[in-house]
């Protein structure tokens, strides 16, 4: 899809997309998410640092408790999740989606984009529901005392960040999470992000291909 002659334009597209997404994320965090930080220069540094870290799926934080102090902050959770997902999707997917939105006549998304989007949504939902089942039903310590909306937000956040980043809004450890919850998080980490994305793992497309092959085998095709 991208020839050798288009390496320069592709590189510029990747750099501009990353810069735009990171700056928007940092702007939202600075203006609203990290509003509890009184010093403006410190708030700006924290906003830029965490926006870059989230988009690149690095998971590095400025505080020893990661993002636990913002466990009930919907905006911080949402912005970090969006940055993680966008970085994990890869430029090829975001470029395809952007060009689709700019076209007057809609065309079908590429097979790669459709495969990545479907698998990503499936994994995020699977991870969130899996954590809800493994921790709530087994009375894991992580969600004790949380109101229900915060429980769902935490489960969704941990499902997103476990695959590729590493941020956390709750004190996860082997002592306060169930064995089934640990296995679920390890599975998500093993799968990771998508090809061309900023995360690691065996990639979402590999999992999608394995699932398709398994389904075909079971159907005798």
State where each predicted segment sits:
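Membrane-proximal intracellular helices of multi-pass ion channels
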Residues: 1-221
């Amino acid at each position: 899809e991208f020839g050798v002659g288009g390496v320069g334009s592709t590189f510029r597209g990747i750099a501009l997309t990353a810069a735009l997404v990171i700056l928007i994320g940092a702007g939202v965090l600075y203006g609203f998410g990290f509003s509890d930080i009184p010093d403006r220069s410190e708030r700006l540094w924290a906003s830029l640092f965490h926006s870059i870290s989230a988009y690149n799926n690095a998971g590095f934080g400025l505080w020893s408790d990661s993002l636990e102090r913002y466990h009930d902050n919907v905006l911080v959770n949402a912005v970090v999740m969006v940055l993680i997902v966008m970085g994990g999707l890869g430029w090829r997917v975001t470029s395809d989606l952007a060009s689709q939105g700019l076209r007057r006549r809609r065309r079908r998304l590429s097979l790669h984009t459709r495969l990545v989007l479907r698998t990503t949504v499936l994994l995020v939902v699977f991870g969130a529901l899996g954590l809800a089942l493994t921790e709530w039903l087994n009375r894991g310590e992580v969600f004790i005392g949380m109101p229900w909306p915060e429980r769902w937000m935490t489960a969704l956040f941990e499902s997103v960040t476990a695959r590729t980043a590493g941020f956390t809004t709750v004190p996860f450890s082997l002592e306060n999470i169930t064995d089934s919850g640990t296995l679920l998080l390890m599975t998500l980490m093993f799968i990771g992000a998508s090809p061309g994305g900023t995360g690691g793992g065996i990639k979402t497309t590999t999992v999608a291909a394995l699932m398709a092959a398994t389904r075909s085998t079971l159907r005798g095709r």
